[in-house]
Amino acid sequence: MATFRSEFNSVPNTYNQRLTALKKKLTTCFQQWRQQLLKLHQQQQQPKQQQQQQQHQSQHQHQQQKQKQRGSEHFYNIFVRADCSILSEKVTYLRKFKRIFTARQNLASARTAATAASAKQPVLGRCIGQEEQQLQIVASLFSSTLISKHSSSASITSSSMTIMDNTYIGVRDEYPDIDTEIRSILLANAQNGITISSIKKEYRQLTGTAFPLHDNITDFLLTIPHVTAECCESGKRIFNIKPTEHTRHLHEMILQQRQRDSVSNPIQAQEPPRLWRAQYKRRIPQHFNFNLNTSEKPPAVKISKLQPLATAAAMSNDVYQDNWKHLNNQYQLPQLNAPKNNIHSHIASNPAQLQAALPAEHHPSKHVEEYAHKRRHEYTRTPTTLSCPSTQHDSMFTINSDYDAYLLDFPLLGDDFFLYLARMELKCRFKKFEKVLQSGLCISGQTINAARQRLRLVELPEMTQIIVNIGSEDIMRGRSLVQIEHDFRLLVKEMHNRRFVPVLTTLAPLANCRHDKQTCDKVSRFNKFIRSEGRHLKVIDIHSCLINENGIVRFDCFQNGPRSVTGSSEPYVFWNKIGRQRVLHMIEENLEYY
């Protein structure tokens, strides 16, 4: 968007040099005219001590009137003889101005020198008032394009171009808080600015009343201090506000916020990406030389009822594109030909046996029919294969279970954050037939105490390094910090008793609790406790990779909104693809085998 901004306050710099020269001449003439009127008014108010002084004063006034007429004639020569061809759209205003100027000269010529001295003061005061009113009328006609507002004490050499706000005194008297309300609207939209129509709409939502002005809204907005205007290529005027000392912190906070994606239809925003099923089609071993797409026949069976996990997923209305993959295994076919499927599933899970079995097969069409009856989820990648394509992450699982959350040989222990990290990046699968999503030692809504109870039942080799990231659920439930720290110490002690090696990680920032200072302080203090508790252990600082150098949370590493989880009543704002990759990279950089 091509924009331009005036070097003066609140006025777009869009006029050529000829118009600028004319404006300067008009401004100088009006200043001289007004100063002469003020001097004349001050002289009329001085006490008249002697008649000679009154006569001398009348002569002096007569000379001042002559000088004023000369100044007016000089102004007339400047104004009438000026080349106004560039002001084609202002012809109506120029005509009105000439009529006012002619009426003013006729009024000056109608004065008689024989008027009594006692009658001169009200007449002169009335004339001065009329001339002041004429100046205000002319200023309102030319608005922000020709006339600049100058106070009586302003310097003649001043050239600041602003708009006279005397016209909108009535509006501000009727709506005393309108300037503050408009400034708050502009400050809330400081990232990209806001148009007049949007200002009207937000003003109605904020106050419950319609915007009081219908004409000259641009001029009115520019009378508000620190308001600026820009113009884009399409011609729309974009308004914004400059920060002050009191609002600079709010202005910087708004500029650092994530920009919302403009979606015209909220229903379309919840739809999955187009042709998303094609990304998760059945994986066929690449060792076969035949094409299953030409010979595969769909099974002639009805789809079974949804499992409890699928039912819970179907009832949820919130859909996030980067978490859509977990629905891949929700809709399953009944287990037909169980012995055959089990045999082929066992062969497919062991690539060495699969390669040994291939030379002995002589009827590929038979295998095509058998693989056509395999369930959909049996073709998806399991932890025994590469977790991601070569373009993503290259970690490999060495665990035989299809459900445990592992990073290489390191089991993960945590709540929803590690659970979805394992599902989305490491391709671990949720345990079937469970209402609460879980994978290995990662369970949705798991607290520290629940993790300690579950750790007693797990069977793992001694000296197994377990990556621990837990405590967010306890903090979101509002538990006291000392109780959380006590449970965490018991968890570490239980791992030592089982001869496991804990790899501690700090808690990530809770994106949906950043407004709560008490919660943020509790997260910071708990992370400090983890570093102190793990001074003799390995501690991975996940929190540092999700904040910038100024300590501000990287909201571009989080999803756009909170999401309800199956194991907790508290919603979570999960990490998006960027955040998960940053966390995974941080963990792998600090891992090593003993």
UniProtKB/Swiss-Prot annotation:
Residues 174-243 form the HTH OST-type domain. GO terms for cellular component: germ cell nucleus; P granule; posterior cell cortex. Keywords: Developmental protein. The keyword Lipid metabolism does not apply. GO terms for biological process: cortical actin cytoskeleton organization; oocyte microtubule cytoskeleton polarization; P granule assembly; pole cell formation; posterior abdomen determination; protein localization to nucleus; regulation of mRNA stability; thermosensory behavior. Residues 44-62 have a biased composition (Low complexity). Posterior pole of the oocyte. It comes from the Eukaryota. Residues 44-68 are annotated as: Disordered. Signal peptide: none annotated. InterPro entries: LOTUS-like, OSK, OST-HTH/LOTUS_dom, SGNH_hydro_sf. Pfam families: OSK (PF17182), OST-HTH (PF12872). One of its GO terms (molecular function) is mRNA binding. Organizes the germ plasm and directs localization of the posterior determinant nanos. Oskar protein is required to keep oskar RNA and staufen protein at the posterior pole. Interacts with smaug (smg). This is Maternal effect protein oskar. It comes from Drosophila virilis. The gene is osk.
